[in-house]
Amino acid sequence: MLPVRSACDLRCRFCFSASSISALERERVGWERLDIDGYYRFAKARGARRLVITGGGEPLLRPDDVLRLIEQGREHFDEITCFTNGTKLTPALARALTDAGLSYLCWSRHHWDDARSRALMGGGPTLAAFFEAAGELTVRATCVMATGFVEDRAGCGAYMDALRPFGVRQFTFKHTYTAFPESVFGGSDEDRWAAGHQVQDDPFAGEGEVLDRLPWGPEIRRIEECQVCFYREPTPAWELENRLCRSTNLMADGGVYASLEDRRSLLYRLASSPKRPSGSA
């Protein structure tokens, strides 16, 4: 779910949203008027196993929307997460996220060193400031790998070593995503930067115990006390061939898409919500 179309207070050099349908001009609708429960049922009936609140921008720019989506989502999903760059997280918001039903917070943090991370992301909190705000929230650290930054197994190890003292035991390292060749969104400054700084090979290949494997290949491993995954997106060609999409994506304008790169993948648009019974969450 992408409640924020494109607003963000940071400027990651590789920003995928700049090369996706999030970059299209579209009018945001008030999600409180939409049939969100109907969308949750639609997604779950088609195999969705977790609710992910992310965005073409920073979701916590709309904290009330995020909390409402989580509260409704816990009626449908056992696993709920939200991606954030951490700039808007406060101790009070962290507690509210926990109370609403968030399972864990995915923190987009792309280098272990504060200065190097700010150089790549255009800002962001220090490690110490973020974890002070996060409090007791379970945090899954998410790092996009890029040459010159976190680019190999040694860099991944240094990243994990820096975050483990703060209690982090879940790590996702992501390949440097670029738009697929036929995409109308290729050629953005961010896409060109990503293409020139690509890291595509799994730095953890052959290590640890494989706990699970996603249908298109990424493996979730246990390495010592940590859960680690090198994640790459499925290609649109793979999704078409296998008739399986990574996710359904509810956009800020109420459109539901099978792909964030193909505007032709619109599945439907949410209608207004029927009134929820008095006293319901």
Model regions and ranges:
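Short, well-ordered coil/turn segments that N-cap beta-strands
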Residues: G47-R50, H76-I80, G101-S103, G135-T138, ...
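Radical SAM enzyme [4Fe-4S]-AdoMet core and its adjacent flexible, acidic
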Residues: L24-R26, A115-L240, E261
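Non-catalytic positions within long, well-ordered alpha-helices that form the structural scaffold/packing
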Residues: K44, T98, D161-R164
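Canonical Radical SAM [4Fe-4S] cluster-binding loop centered on the CxxxCxxC motif
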Residues: M1-L34
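Flexible mid-to-C-terminal extensions adjoining Fe-S/redox cofactors in radical SAM and related proteins
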Residues: P236-A281
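Hydrophobic faces of well-ordered beta-strands that scaffold small-molecule active sites
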Residues: L2, L51-I53, I80-C82, L105-W107, ...
